[in-house]
Amino acid sequence: MEIGQYQPNLDGDGLRIGIVQARFNEPVCNGLADSCIEELERLGVTGEDVLLVTVPGALEIPLALQKLAESAQFDALIALGAVIRGETYHFELVSNESGAGITRIGLDFGIPVANAVLTTENDEQAVARMTEKGRDAARVAVEMANLAVALEQLGGDDEEEDEEEEEA
């Protein structure tokens, strides 16, 4: 049996990407942003097609993502932040709530959201992960934006066929 397959597409040319970056644990978050933006550029996303918004901390990320999603100006969104257990007594709350909120935005608005909010035990773990996780977020955003477009086109073909049948 032969099956259809979609090949991952990492061509960022023409894609609009919105990034929400937390400022809490700023050195780590800046490292995430730098590597993410560098990778977006490498994938063909231009600077004029990227909007970076900063918020106080991880719990504020979902609201900013929601506002960007509501604008309908972006093909994908990226969440950047760092929740470090030693930095806050309510680590689990911040980690769980920010993660759930970030996921909900993607599902509620039908827009890909790459979640690069690090949750680590200490600063050393966060620093060790920030560069690769920032790059990963860029790749996820571009790949999923292209996948979303391809999957939407599948649905669009059926609608056109239905309209043609109704006219006949």
Swiss-Prot record:
GO terms for molecular function: 6,7-dimethyl-8-ribityllumazine synthase activity. The keyword Transferase applies. (2S)-2-hydroxy-3-oxobutyl phosphate binds at residues 87-88, 129. Pfam families: DMRL_synthase (PF00885). The active site is at residue 90. Keywords: Riboflavin biosynthesis, Transferase. It catalyses: (2S)-2-hydroxy-3-oxobutyl phosphate + 5-amino-6-(D-ribitylamino)uracil = 6,7-dimethyl-8-(1-D-ribityl)lumazine + phosphate + 2 H2O + H(+). 5-amino-6-(D-ribitylamino)uracil binds at residues 24, 58-60, 82-84, 115. Its EC number is 2.5.1.78. The keyword Transferase applies. It is an enzyme of class 2 (transferase). GO terms for biological process: riboflavin biosynthetic process. Transmembrane segments: none annotated. Pathway: Cofactor biosynthesis; riboflavin biosynthesis; riboflavin from 2-hydroxy-3-oxobutyl phosphate and 5-amino-6-(D-ribitylamino)uracil: step 1/2. InterPro entries: LS (IPR034964), LS/RS (IPR002180), LS/RS_sf (IPR036467). One of its GO terms (cellular component) is cytosol. PANTHER family: 6,7-DIMETHYL-8-RIBITYLLUMAZINE SYNTHASE (PTHR21058:SF0), 6,7-DIMETHYL-8-RIBITYLLUMAZINE SYNTHASE DMRL SYNTHASE LUMAZINE SYNTHASE (PTHR21058). Catalyzes the formation of 6,7-dimethyl-8-ribityllumazine by condensation of 5-amino-6-(D-ribitylamino)uracil with 3,4-dihydroxy-2-butanone 4-phosphate. This is the penultimate step in the biosynthesis of riboflavin. Belongs to the DMRL synthase family. This is 6,7-dimethyl-8-ribityllumazine synthase. It comes from Paraburkholderia phytofirmans (strain DSM 17436 / LMG 22146 / PsJN) (Burkholderia phytofirmans).
